Amino acid sequence: MFARVITVHAQPGKIDEAATVYRDSIIPAAKKQKGFKDAMLLTDPVTGKGISVTLWETEADQKASEASGYVAQQLGKLAAVLAGPPARESFLVSAKS
């Protein structure tokens, strides 16, 4: 299993709006992607920092979601509330409950 971690910083006072978009639009879209397993958004309402973690069945599934433009499309849904560009990282999931 593989994880994509995307860190964002929301404009002041906009982290709740970002969480709503993530919950109501991004997660439903993710569920339609091949190999998608799970998603969560961690937020700090004081700093406006958000960390998205998505889990993928295989590395190929994760990379395909990037190559297809899916990830860019989802980040575009957050563009109006972000203070800067997101940072993307990928990881092998070494342990999970």
Short names for language-model regions:
Residues 2, 7-11, 37-47, 74-97:
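Glycine-rich beta-strand-turn "strand-cap" elements at beta-sheet edges
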Residues 9-19:
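Short, surface-exposed ligand-recognition loops at beta-strand->loop->(often short) alpha-helix junctions
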Residues 12, 47-48, 58-62:
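Short, charged/polar surface micro-motifs in flexible loops or helix N-caps
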Residues 14-16, 26-29, 41-42:
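Intrinsically disordered, low-complexity segments enriched in polar/charged residues with Gly/Pro
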Residues 15-17, 61-63, 97:
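Intrinsically disordered, low-complexity acidic/polar segments
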Residues 24-37, 55-89:
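An amphipathic, aromatic/His-enriched active-site/gating alpha helix that lines ligand/cofactor pockets
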